[in-house]
C-alpha cells in the first residue's frame, strides 16, 4: 500500500511536469498540498532528480536566459523570481554569471530605453522615468547609467 501511494505521488508529479518545468521546491509544495509526508516528498523528489526530470540548475539557467532575452528583465528581478520558486541562491548566482557571458545586457537596456523614448528628446523627467522603469525591471543603476551615457554619446 505504501509503495502504491508513493507511485501515486510520483505519477502526480510526472503529470505536472508534462505541462511545464518546475523547480524541486515547487514540486515539493504541490506534493505537500496533495497530502504527501516529508518522507514521501523526499522519495518522489529523489526519483525525479535521479531520472533527470527535475534539475534546479538547468531550470535556473533556462529561466535566467529567457528572462534576460524575452522578458527583458534585469538581474535583481530574475534573482527575486527564482527565490520565490525556491531555487538556491548559489545556483541563482551561478546561472546569472553563466548567462551574462552570453547575453549583452547593455544592448537590452538600450533597446528598452529606445522604446520608452521614441522621439529622441530627453528631459530630466523623462530620464528619471526611464531609470525608474528599468530599475523596476531589475536592472542595476550602474548598468542603466552606462547605457544612458552611451546613448548620449551617439
Task: Give the label of every model feature segment.
Residues 1-154:
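An alpha-helical, amphipathic repeat domain used for nucleic-acid recognition
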